[in-house]
Amino acid sequence: MELVLVRHAEPEWVREGLSVDNPPLTDRGRDQARRLADRLAHEHFDAVMVSTMQRACQTAAPLLEVLGAEPRFENWLEELRMPDWTGTPSEEVDELFTRARARPIEDHWDGMAGGESFRAFHERITKGLEASLAPLGTFPTDDDTPLWEIDDEDARVLVVAHAGTNATIIGHMLGIQPLPWEWERFVMFHASFSVLRPMRIGQGWSFNLFKLGDAEHLPDQMRTR
């Protein structure tokens, strides 16, 4: 079973100097999404899952059109949930992130004050992933090894989500110990895609990271993070 993970295109995080919660795409982001759709237009997927957040839905729209696919919109795919900073000056939000990064390592697991903890986020993503893959015949083995059972190794699943979500999925599928900055370990630009592929190991299957953040469909001047 191959898993293709798309990160949403560039969102409009700031409008007139103020932060926007659950933002739409920028004009450049919409162009990025169209180019992504052109890149993947001739691919086939057995299942498509899309985050319910606006930036993911708008990124998925041209892709779903060219694929002729019927998606499942999944709220478990949402990004790490931050406090609602709508209307807060963007400089204040930047300062909050700067302070958060300077915290003691153990405090990073708590997330931002008023938002979702990384512990809760990691549990939401991994449990949602396993529950969604099980009907497709893919689920973890019962032992302590990071191996999977796969009924259909040729199945292909497309996910349109977020940097944190996709990085957490990658780490979980690879059996890597989680850290509360997963999105910094696996860097993915806007409207890029990553690919996980299975390989037989003993009596189970292990996944390899075949591609990470492929953005070859975007010229350099259109690549954003």
What role is predicted for each listed range?
Residues 163-167, 192:
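GST superfamily/GST-like fold recognition
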Residues 2-6, 151-161:
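Beta-strand elements within well-structured catalytic alpha/beta cores of enzymes
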